[in-house]
């Protein structure tokens, strides 16, 4: 079996991948993550997931390389990582009482053959009605400024949800394990 490489610096994705109990290493790819004109959110995450994997193929020529990328979409608009309290407050205020769809692009590249599998896994979060005081308490408690949509579903962010909808809850955290297992099996990897 080729070695596994996770093309990411995300501690969330690293933690998720450990659940499969397969040995892997991590390396952060250096790519331009800019959104192209006329590119849908679906196409964006698929492209970036594959570009992340391809960026490391030369350095890791005999690996199965996992790339992933995620965006949150609210009312047709892509929500990026907020980076600041003020931007996170804006995002959560806009999301209050509505639904946010997370699109997670996933790519598995066999760097020996160049063959790849790519998919996009959606997951929708239906948000509670949130007042400004609740949003501010949450932001001060968790500081989710590095997370698309301004919350951490794996932490206190779940308290902001009314319900969720999707086929793979791990996609919400950034690495859809159910779909990844399908891809790994197609590459001959035994899981479990």
From Swiss-Prot:
GO biological process: nucleotide metabolic process
Signal peptide stretch: none
Protein location: Cytoplasm
InterPro entries from the UniProt entry: ITPase-like_fam, Maf-like
Function according to Swiss-Prot or TrEMBL: Nucleoside triphosphate pyrophosphatase that hydrolyzes 7-methyl-GTP (m(7)GTP). May have a dual role in cell division arrest and in preventing the incorporation of modified nucleotides into cellular nucleic acids.
Family of the protein in this entry: Belongs to the Maf family. YceF subfamily.
Name of the protein in question: 7-methyl-GTP pyrophosphatase
């Amino acid at each position: 079996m080729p070695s596994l490489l996770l093309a990411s610096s995300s501690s969330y994705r690293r933690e998720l991948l450990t659940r499969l109990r397969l040995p892997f290493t991590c390396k952060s790819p250096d790519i331009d993550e800019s959104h192209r004109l006329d590119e849908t959110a679906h196409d964006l995450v698929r492209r970036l997931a594959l570009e992340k994997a391809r960026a490391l193929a030369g350095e890791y020529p005999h690996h199965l390389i996992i790339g992933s990328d995620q965006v949150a979409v609210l009312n047709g608009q892509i929500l990026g990582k907020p980076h600041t309290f003020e931007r996170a407050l804006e995002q959560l205020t806009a999301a209050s009482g509505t639904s946010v769809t997370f699109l997670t692009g996933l790519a598995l590249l066999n760097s020996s053959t160049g063959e790849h599998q790519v998919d996009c896994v959606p997951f929708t979060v239906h948000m509670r009605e949130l007042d400004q005081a609740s949003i501010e308490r949450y932001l001060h408690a968790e500081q989710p400024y590095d997370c698309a949509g301004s919350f951490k579903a794996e932490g206190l962010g779940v308290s902001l949800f009314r319900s969720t909808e999707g086929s793979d809850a791990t996609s919400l955290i950034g690495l859809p394990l159910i779909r990844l297992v399908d891809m790994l099996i197609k590459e001959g990897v035994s899981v479990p």
